[in-house]
Amino acid sequence: MTRTFLNLPALLLAWTVIVVVAYTPTPPKISPATNRPNQLYTWRKQQIRYQQAGPENGDPVLLVHGLFVNSDHWRKTLLGLADEGYNVYAIDLWGYGYSSKPPYDSPEARAVCGENKRFADDESLAILRDVPLGNPSGKGERVRDIELRHPVRSPYNFFTWSELITDFCRQVVPKRPVTLVCNSIGTISSLQAVIDTPDLYTGVCVVTPNFRELHSAEIAFPALSMPVVRAIQKALREKGQPLFDALAKPETVRQILKEPYKVQDAIDDTLVQVLLDPLLSEGASKIVFDTLSYSAGPLPEQQLSIFPDDKPVWITYGTSDPWTPDKRVDALINKPCVEKVVPLPGIGHCPHDEAPELVNPFILEFLKRVKPKDEKEAQ
């Protein structure tokens, strides 16, 4: 008994190492999507995969991916912006791609959580009262309370990811203001990063926002419907592995992508491979179901209402996106920080991969808009 007690620190350390190694996938040396080296950044003892392209003295840009994908989803943007002289980074958010995926309830994961300090001193900060939100019609507003804390206190949340973005920009990107380009739910992490640390960023270019239809503030009659939703979420977390195994196959992934992608030719073998391979790594399925249980956190209209006015936001989106109400996106132009909203007819949820010939010029125009004044004058 005494020997076991004395060895306890060593046993705990060994167990931590085992957990870190087991839930830290090894990426290929070269990304098959971009032909760029996969690089690793150690963040809070976690592995974060990222890619970089373009001259290091170029204006820095960070690409932030959306739900269940990874930095390879920016394959056409990373290289397109780099060819124009920008220093471009694309990151795998913690829990996605080839970044670490420890179990959400492990001590290792809990230590990383971005909610730890944010709500520690005042629990009342975890709920925003009477927040105006948009409607699918784009007309009028609904007033809702917004729960900010993850319902099961998972560390895989927007506050954690926003802190990762900021730490990455401070520690990896050359010390210059960074422009964020984001897709889908990557928008929420990106907006939060700028809200929390505005001096580090020039602005945000949004390629399709996400209104998070599973959020408790977005679901109709939440007092009645949320208990049912959370029961389903709990069942998926606990017993969803067979369903995940059935869906995590190349042909199934290809079929699933046909819903958000309206430009079907963009769904090639490389896309299927680079999205599926990391999802087959240890711990990935648990992160998928954990994310589907995330019915709280910030919402884009709430964030844009408190966004720094001197940090421009431009938005583009596909009008054929089945998940994003176009009129509600158009209404975001009424937020003071939003300078431009551009619809792309016939494009789906992933315009950067479906129509890079339209999206890359839009991003490049935004990058010129936010270029530091002294650099503009020097040109």
Give, region by region, the residue ranges found by the protein language model:
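Active-site loop/oxyanion-hole signature of alpha/beta-hydrolase fold enzymes
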Residues: P37-R44, Q51, L93-V181, P361
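Short beta-strand-to-loop junctions in surface cap/lid or active-site-entrance loops
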Residues: I48-D59
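Active-site glycine-rich loops that stabilize anionic/oxyanionic intermediates
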Residues: G58, G66-V69, S184-I185
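Serine-hydrolase catalytic-loop signature spanning alpha/beta hydrolases and amidase-signature enzymes
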Residues: G66-K76, V88
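Flexible "cap/lid" loop of the alpha/beta hydrolase fold
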Residues: I188-L191, I195, L200-G240
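Conserved alpha/beta-hydrolase catalytic His-Asp/Glu region
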Residues: S216, G240-F307
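Conserved loop-alpha-helix segment in the C-terminal half of the alpha/beta-hydrolase fold
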Residues: I306-I347
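Catalytic active-site module of serine/aspartate enzymes centered on a nucleophile-bearing elbow/loop
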Residues: C337-Q379
